[in-house]
Regions:
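Extracellular polysaccharide-degrading/modifying enzymes targeting complex plant/algal/animal polysaccharides
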Residues: 3-294, 299-301, 538-586
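Beta-strand repeat scaffolds of extracellular/surface proteins
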Residues: 18, 24-27, 33-38, 43-46, ...
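Extracellular beta-strand solenoid repeats
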Residues: 22, 34, 42, 49, ...
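Predominantly extracellular beta-rich ligand-binding scaffolds that present long acidic/polar faces
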Residues: 30-40, 448-572
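Short glycine/acidic-rich loop motifs that flank beta-strands on beta-rich extracellular proteins
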Residues: 32, 268-274, 304-310, 326-334, ...
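Beta-propeller domains
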Residues: 189-196, 204-205, 231-254, 268, ...
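Aromatic- and glycine-enriched glycan-recognition loops and surfaces
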Residues: 248-250, 276-291, 301-302, 306-315, ...
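Right-handed parallel beta-helix
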Residues: 255-266, 291-302, 315-328, 339-354, ...
Length: 586
């Protein structure tokens, strides 16, 4: 049995030999193991750390100069008299730090929220499937951002990075130089600043902002990392600096691999533009092409990138009973679809993801069945599944879309013949004027879905259909007692059929669709304002409005409301029993 006293070479040799390899409980630092052949790794509770223990030094705070608030910044704060410091050589600023088993964030301006920049990019987005921008951005537009006059005065930018928000994704890049109001990046961002009408940004790794307990600053010139400790933390507090991108990795195609019973923590992915879903970031478990893989009973926490990522074709990957939480990016990311043998993620608890990269998605995968998971506290979408002929069922999703927009509890594009049933989504409302924060979102080129017996509670926008169609929505319950409700069918030549659904809102209900793009049969509506509006759309624009016509098969009902803890939902003759949503007990 492997134990923490074994050398790295001894552990790697045991894994290289294949077969069953058991680890004794304990903490294994500098964990970075290559997998080359069929192997069954049994953790027995072992904690694998992809980094090294920090030897803290208590130092006087060198950043005590008074920094007044600028627009969008926090008010002045009293600085700590001392900080914890360690050596941290390296040209790139560290983004990850693990203290007491949790990720810590870098010092940030503003302390929360975002600043406004002055860049504009008034070019129409045509849709991903139609090639993106109507005009391709120039190199200069992808490399620069214009800030407000004086916004960066008095700020040390030697080791600074900047997050540029792009509605449904973000770019985190190094600041190369500043000339007047123009910030130049070290690498191009994903979309031009100001695109999609979004003009927000924030700065990271600013010493003048090191005024919040639990944050850190990495001075790349001096090779020092400074940490502002939380109450109760001192130079004896256990902390780790990451050394590796991955803890387990396979560079070549791998098959018949099983990993169970480990805690994995402390990784630092490469500094790249992460793109949609942060898919460019590596995972604590990093695979290429993989088949017959089982990952179960894992606790993946405090890693800087994804929990699990596969970049190649995946056959029969089974992810079950994993707890993936408090991480920089998403829990699961697979990039390549496989229509031959389906994979599955089931009975997992996923939460507090996207801590470093807001565009990260809880579960983002191709051709995966997604069953009995609990996903919450995500910066962007909870689920984003692509492919064909799979099932999304009995998942419990809440507190999602906390930062970005144009996403959903469940969001899919270019998918076919999918069944989504018996899922429960709670609490997605507009934020800062943005309404595209949706419960169930079928996006470009999705076809032939059956969406049945799902519930969305306190969701302003329970259902969005965009450039897709041939879907059946059957016997779902959508409730927003907090205000108005929207659902729609936009920019499509196909149809959506709504049969036996319940829509209940504490305000008006608006159905946006192109003429005759939806059919309605035996649906029940309640609007507290008494208004159920049909906005007639063409090419994404409203060209007329009328009241949605009720008939013998579509009719008004009394208000519908449920407590958050409710799991059996009854409206008239329709009952949806969701007592078994989320992870099951073994």
């Amino acid at each position: 049995m492997i134990n923490p006293n074994n050398t790295y070479e001894e552990i790697q040799a045991a894994i290289d030999a294949g077969g069953t390899v058991e680890f004794a409980p304990g903490i294994y630092e500098h964990a970075h193991y290559r997998i080359t052949k069929p192997v069954h790794l049994v953790g027995n509770g072992a904690v694998l750390v992809g980094g090294k223990r920090i030897q803290w030094e208590r130092v006087e705070n060198p950043f005590t100069q008074d920094q007044g608030p600028k627009e969008g910044q926090a008010e002045k704060k009293q600085c700590s008299e001392y900080l914890l410091c360690c050596n941290a050589p390296g040209e790139q600023p560290l983004r990850s730090l693990v203290v007491n088993g949790e990720l810590r964030k870098r010092c940030r301006l503003p302390e929360s929220g975002y600043c406004k920049h002055e860049s504009v990019f008034p070019v129409r987005w045509m849709g991903t499937s139609l090639g993106g921008w109507e005009r391709k951005p120039t190199d200069e537009e992808l490399m620069t951002l214009r800030v407000a006059e004086g916004a960066l005065d008095g700020i040390t930018l030697d080791s600074a990075e900047i997050t540029v928000v792009h509605s449904w994704s973000d770019s985190l890049v190094r600041i190369d130089k500043v000339e007047g109001q123009i910030v130049t990046f070290d690498i191009p961002v994903e979309f031009p600043a100001g695109g999609f009408g979004v003009n927000t940004y924030c700065l990271w790794n600013i010493p003048e902002a090191l005024k919040v307990p639990g944050t850190f600053y990495h001075d790349t010139k001096a090779g020092k990392l400074y940490y502002y400790p939380l109450p109760g933390e001192d130079e004896h507090t256990v902390a780790y600096l990451p050394e590796y991108e991955n803890i387990f990795y396979a560079e070549e195609p791998i098959s018949d691999m099983e990993i169970e019973g480990f805690t994995l923590m402390c990784t630092e992915p490469s500094h790249v533009v992460v793109r949609f879903g942060a898919f460019k970031l590596s995972g604590a478990i990093e695979l290429g092409e993989a088949s017959n893989v089982k990952l179960h009973d894992l606790d993946i926490t405090a890693v800087g990138g994804h929990g699990i990522r596969a970049t190649g074709k995946v056959n029969n990957m089974q992810v079950s009973y994993c707890h993936i939480h408090g991480i920089g990016a998403g829990a699961l990311r697979t990039n390549v679809r496989n229509e031959e043998v389906k994979s599955e993620i089931t009975d997992c608890h996923i939460h507090h993801v996207g801590l470093y990269y807001p565009s990260a998605i809880g579960i983002s995968a191709g051709d995966f069945h997604v069953r009995h998971n609990e996903v919450h506290d995500t910066s962007y979408s909870a689920l984003c599944i692509s492919g064909s002929d799979f099932v999304i069922e009995k998942n419990h999703i809440y507190n999602t879309m906390l930062i970005l927009n144009d996403g959903a509890a469940s969001h899919s594009g270019n998918t076919h013949r999918v069944t989504m049933r018996n899922n429960l989504v709670y609490g997605i409302q507009p934020k800062d004027g943005h309404r595209l924060r949706i419960a169930y979102y079928l996006d470009e080129l999705t076809r032939d879905w059956v969406v049945e017996h799902n519930v969305a509670l306190e969701c302003n926008f329970p259902n969005h259909n965009h450039m897709c169609g041939d879907h059946l929505y059957k016997e779902n319950i959508f409730v927003n007692s907090k205000g108005s409700m929207f659902f729609d069918m936009l920019n499509t030549k196909w149809m959506c059929n709504y049969v036996g659904n319940v829509f209940s809102a504490g305000g008006d209900i608006t159905v946006r669709m192109e003429e005759d793009a939806m059919t309605f049969e035996n649906n029940r509506f309640h609007s507290a304002d008494g208004v159920i509006r049909h906005s007639i759309m063409k090419n994404g624009e409203i060209i007329g409005e009328k009241l949605l016509e009720m008939s013998d098969s579509n009719h008004h009902i009394e208000a519908v409301s449920f407590e958050r803890e409710t799991r059996v939902f009854t409206v008239g003759e329709l009952t949806i029993d969701l007592r078994d949503v989320g992870p099951r007990h073994r």
